[in-house]
Amino acid sequence: AGTSIFAMLVLDKPLKGYYPEIDVVTTPCGAPVAMVHCNNCSSELDAWVKIFGEFAQLSGHPIAKPALYDMLYYHALTGDPDCGNTVVYNFLSGEPVAGAENGRPMYFRTPDGKFNLANLFRAEIYSTMAALKLGMDILFEKEQVSVEKITGHGGLFKTKGVAQQFLADGLGCAVSVMKTAGEGGAWGMALLAAYTVCGGGKSLSEFLDSEVFVGMESTTLQPEKNGAKGLSLIHISEPTRRSY
């Protein structure tokens, strides 16, 4: 999860239906996978972080980028579950999963909503995974795909326990994040290269389990009951999205 976001679920059996929101691919070992890919994730959120970085610079008290991200992300944890009736659409480009043909980043709030910094950034972080939830709900509700745990990876998870908790809340399942979560796609390609050279006849899954991820430090968070009401607000507003 970074500039874009996607989820890949290895399936026990083929999907019963066809859905434009779902891509059916395979693992390198040939196992069937349902993939939900969304074009937009953290770019709009990053733009807002940059705005507050500029403000800190103007105030004469500049804040280093990692510290600024941590400050704003952790503050989002103190926001209301419904983000004070603040809703963010982070579509810098079209988002087919949500039916949006063109990018139109926007935010909305009700006149009587509780608009503050914590709720704004909670809504911004929710927006990074809202379109993903639309596709995942198809798998959960129409295909009865069950998931015990999802492993989160990407820059969105660099600040420990924030996006991870919101994703667990939104998808209704446990989310684990490894120590290497902040590494990008180049790291994954390096693992495949290492497997090609050092696989020793093992399957890719066996190699990863025995050579790469064994003993890897990770944390797992469970969904909280009322944790993602803001994501529900975004879904209620779906017809509005389709009018972009």
Regions found by a protein language model. Give the residues of each.
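Phosphate-binding/catalytic loop of phosphoryl-transfer enzymes
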Residues: 1-9
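Glycine/Thr-rich phosphate-binding loops that ligate phosphate moieties of nucleotide
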Residues: 9-238, 243
